[in-house]
């Protein structure tokens, strides 16, 4: 017998729904700037810049101090704990700089993977202990949404039913705790692109994963109108020899979503999954042009695919601030256009934008 004990008040629901809708309004998407210290170090190493707190702060200051018109393309920014409390050169908190631009501030809440014994190297995600207290403090500090990434991979006997169910339940528990504390949960079940599987295999697995996630969200009384989904696009594995067009990726992706994601969800913000900047934009554009019913906003939550050209332009030099901001603005505007199905590839995007950003077994 199902009993009804309201999880949220009408006021809480209204606030959550308004936050979620504002993030994805009018083609806006999310900048994922929540890389851990180690992951940011890998990015800096590629441009031969030392991984110090000051260098990380300087790069993020350049991104966040971009012209206020960025709020036409970026509705939210996900921060790492370190970045939430960092300041610009004048002593102003980054989070306040973003808020003054009308951008919603988010925070990475998961604490990385832990092995699932008895599986083929599968993992679940840590971070539920003390999560409510962390969410409450972050809300006081100006944060309005959270992010939790669960990782599933396609391999021999993977993903297992155990991994799918365990990660779905962890995502649902996280989402419930977020909402109790006034944070919109971004639910991120990522089927990573490692492997040589084809498009059809990825679609099958993605559908199974998303179906389990939404069953778990329902079980945990999560208010869907106050959530956002951050899934992988349906793509072939990175090592697959067969290549697919953006239109094929779009059809497989929207079909999978149409079969599994309730229309109550206000927005779906895709992760880029190691695609080049340009491929991530072209695929998003094709998804928005796909001739299937699309009751949700279909947008982006990109990290590498919004920052690669900007990092290359910066190179660790303060003198390159203007070029760095220009590169970032260009990618943000391109993805905003793609989120409306209006992006036109010009062929003049620059070398950095066409390089694959794939990293095997990628972790934030």
From Swiss-Prot:
Entry's Pfam families?
Answer: Glycolytic (PF00274)
Q: What is the effect of changing residue 338 to V?
A: In HFI; Turkey and South Europe
Residues modified as Phosphoserine: 36, 89, 132, 272, 276, 299, 301, 309
What does the record say mutating residue 74 to T does? Answer: In HFI; affects proper folding
Sites of Phosphothreonine modification: 39, 119
Q: Which EC numbers characterise this protein's activity in its record?
A: 4.1.2.13
The active site annotation covers 188 (proton acceptor), 230 (schiff-base intermediate with dihydroxyacetone-p)
Q: What is the effect of changing residue 335 to K?
A: In HFI; frequent mutation
Which terms are listed as keywords in the entry?
Acetylation, Cytoplasm, Cytoskeleton, Disease variant, Glycolysis, Lyase, Phosphoprotein, Schiff base
Annotated binding of beta-D-fructose 1,6-bisphosphate, by residue: 43, 272-274, 304
* CDD domains noted in UniProt: FBP_aldolase_I_a
List the catalysed reactions: beta-D-fructose 1,6-bisphosphate = D-glyceraldehyde 3-phosphate + dihydroxyacetone phosphate; beta-D-fructose 1-phosphate = D-glyceraldehyde + dihydroxyacetone phosphate
Give the result of residue 229 to P, as annotated.
In HFI; affects proper folding
Q: In which pathway does it act?
A: Carbohydrate degradation; glycolysis; D-glyceraldehyde 3-phosphate and glycerone phosphate from D-glucose: step 4/4; Carbohydrate biosynthesis; gluconeogenesis; Carbohydrate metabolism; fructose metabolism
**Effect after changing residue 222 to F:** In HFI; affects proper folding
Q: Which GO terms describe its biological process?
A: fructose 1,6-bisphosphate metabolic process; fructose catabolic process to hydroxyacetone phosphate and glyceraldehyde-3-phosphate; fructose metabolic process; gluconeogenesis; glycolytic process; negative regulation of pentose-phosphate shunt; vacuolar proton-transporting V-type ATPase complex assembly
Q: Where does the signal sequence lie?
A: none
Where is it found, in Gene Ontology cellular component terms? centriolar satellite; cytosol; extracellular exosome; microtubule organizing center
Q: Where in the cell is it found?
A: Cytoplasm, Cytosol; Cytoplasm, Cytoskeleton, Microtubule organizing center, Centrosome, Centriolar satellite
Site positions for Necessary for preference for fructose 1,6-bisphosphate over fructose 1-phosphate, renumbered to this chain? 364
* Miscellaneous section: In vertebrates, 3 forms of this ubiquitous glycolytic enzyme are found, aldolase A in muscle, aldolase B in liver and aldolase C in brain.
Q: How does it assemble?
A: Homotetramer. Interacts with BBS1, BBS2, BBS4 and BBS7. Forms a ternary complex with G6PD and TP53; this interaction is direct.
Stored NCBIfam families: FrucBisAld_I
Q: What is this protein called?
A: Fructose-bisphosphate aldolase B
């Amino acid at each position: 017998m199902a009993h009804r004990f309201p999880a949220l008040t009408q006021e809480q629901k209204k606030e959550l729904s308004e936050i979620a809708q504002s993030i994805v309004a009018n083609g806006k998407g999310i900048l994922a700037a929540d890389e851990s210290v180690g992951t940011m170090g890998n990015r800096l190493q590629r441009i031969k810049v030392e991984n110090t707190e000051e260098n990380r702060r300087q790069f993020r200051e350049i991104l966040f101090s971009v012209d206020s018109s960025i709020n036409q393309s970026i509705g939210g920014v996900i921060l790492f704990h370190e970045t939430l409390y960092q300041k610009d050169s004048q002593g102003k908190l980054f989070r306040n700089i973003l808020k003054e631009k009308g951008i919603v501030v988010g925070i990475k809440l998961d604490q990385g993977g832990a092995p699932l014994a008895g599986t083929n190297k599968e993992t679940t995600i840590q971070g539920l202990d003390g999560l409510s207290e962390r969410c409450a403090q972050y809300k006081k500090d100006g944060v309005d949404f959270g992010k939790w990434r669960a990782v599933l991979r396609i391999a021999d006997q993977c993903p297992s039913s155990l991994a799918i169910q365990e990660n779905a339940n962890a995502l649902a528990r996280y989402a419930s705790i977020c909402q109790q504390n006034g944070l919109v949960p971004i639910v991120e079940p990522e089927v990573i692109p490692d492997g040589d599987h084809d498009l059809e295999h990825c679609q099958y697995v993605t559908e199974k994963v998303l179906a389990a996630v939404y069953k778990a969200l329902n079980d945990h009384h999560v208010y869907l109108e106050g959530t956002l989904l951050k899934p992988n696009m349906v793509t072939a594995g990175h090592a697959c020899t067969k290549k697919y067009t953006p239109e094929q990726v779009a059809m497989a992706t929207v079909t999978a979503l149409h079969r599994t994601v309730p229309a109550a969800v206000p927005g779906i913000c895709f992760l880029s999954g190691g695609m080049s900047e340009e491929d991530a934009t072209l695929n998003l554009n094709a998804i928005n042009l796909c001739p299937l019913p699309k009751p949700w906003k279909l947008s982006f939550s990109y990290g590498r695919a919004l920052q690669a050209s900007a990092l290359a332009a910066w190179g660790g030099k303060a003198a390159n601030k203007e070029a760095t901001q220009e590169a970032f603005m260009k990618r943000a505007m391109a993805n905003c256009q793609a989120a409306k199905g209006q992006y036109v590839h010009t062929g003049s995007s620059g070398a950095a934008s066409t390089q694959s950003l794939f990293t095997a077994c990628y972790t934030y």
